[in-house]
Amino acid sequence: MNATERPGSDGTGSPESVGSRLKNLLHGPGTCQLMGVHDGLSARIAVAEGFEALWASGLCMSTARGVRDSDEASWTELLTLVGTMTEAAPGAPVLVDGDTGYGNFNTARPSPPAPSCLGAAGVCFEDKVFPKMNSFFGDGHQLAPIGEFSGKIKACKDTQRDPGFVVVARTEALISNLPMEEALTRAHAYVEAVADGLFIHSRMSTPQQIAEFMRQWDGSAPILIAPTTYHRPSLDDFAALGIAGCIWANHSMRAAFSAMRDVCQQIRADRGIFGVEERVAPLKEIFGLLDYESLEQDENRYTQAPDLAPVQG
C-alpha cells in the first residue's frame, strides 16, 4: 500500500485512494471541511489539528511564491508545492486549485494525471478565461463560454488515470454579477460534462446567494463553497443548506502573513528579539510536529550498528 492509499472503508481491507476518500467525504453525511494550505508545513499543521481534507489554494500558493493570484505562478511551480503537501501529509485528500487550467482543453487535460501522480485527490477548475484574476479583486472577471468550459471538464475526465480522482468544476457566475439563472445553467452543464462536484463561489458578505442557489439546486452533484467573505455562519448552518464541502480557503496563509509582518515590525523597532519570544512557537513544538525524534532513533539504528565482516570473494 502506498502513501496515497489507506484500508478501505468497507471492511475488506482493500486500499482506498485519496480520490475515493474525498468522494466519500463529499457524498457522506454532514459537510466536509477542507482546510486551505500552501506548503508542506501548513498541510502538516492542518492534519495535526484534525482536518480530514485539504485545499491547495491557488491564492495561497501564489502568495507563498511572492507573486499575484493571476496565473503568474506556473502550473509546474504550483505542482512543486503540491508535492510538498502530499509528502508532508500522506493519505490526506488534497484538492488542488487548478485555476483555469492555463488555457483551453488541451492545456488543461494533462492536469489530472500530474497532481494524481503526486498523491493529490483531485483538481478544481474555474470557468474564467485565461489569465484569470483573483475573485476578490476588481470586477473584470470574464467567463468562458459554457460549451468551451464543459469541453475542458470532459477532456480532463477523459484523461485521468485514477478512476477515483476528483474533478471539480467551479463557476464564477455570481462573482461576475451574473443572474442566478446563469449560475444554475452553468452548474447543470458542468454536471453533464461529468464533473464530480461543483464549487459555487460568491463574494457577498452574507450567504444569501448560496442559500438561494441551494434552494434551486437539484442535488445532481455535491456542492462546495468557500465562505471567505460571508464568514459569520457556522459549519452547521452550511450543512443545513445541504452543502457537501466547506473550504476554509486562505486563513492559514493570512494568519502567517499577519504574524510574520508583526514579528518583523517588533524586532526592527526593539532592535532585538526580547519582545517577540513569547509570541512565537517554541522550537520544541516544531521539532515535535516534524518528528525529529524518529530521525534520532533511525540514526541510532543505522549509524551505530556493529561493523559487518567484509564479504569474501
Swiss-Prot record:
Pathway involvement of the protein, from the record: Secondary metabolite biosynthesis; bialaphos biosynthesis
Enzymatic reactions: phosphoenolpyruvate + H(+) = 3-phosphonopyruvate
Record-linked InterPro entries: ICL/PEPM, PEnolPyrv_PMutase_core, Pyrv/PenolPyrv_kinase-like_dom, Pyrv_kinase-like_dom_sf
CDD domains named among the record's database cross-references: ICL_PEPM
Function: Formation of a carbon-phosphorus bond by converting phosphoenolpyruvate (PEP) to phosphonopyruvate (P-Pyr).
GO BP term, pick one: antibiotic biosynthetic process
UniProt source species: Streptomyces viridochromogenes (strain DSM 40736 / JCM 4977 / BCRC 1201 / Tue 494)
Segments of this protein annotated with the region Disordered: 1-23
Keywords: Antibiotic biosynthesis, Isomerase
GO molecular-function terms, A-Z: phosphoenolpyruvate mutase activity
Protein origin, superkingdom: Bacteria
Pfam annotation, one family: PEP_mutase
Protein name: Phosphoenolpyruvate phosphomutase
E.C. numbers: 5.4.2.9
Active-site residues per Swiss-Prot or TrEMBL entry: D69
Family that this chain belongs to: Belongs to the isocitrate lyase/PEP mutase superfamily. PEP mutase family.
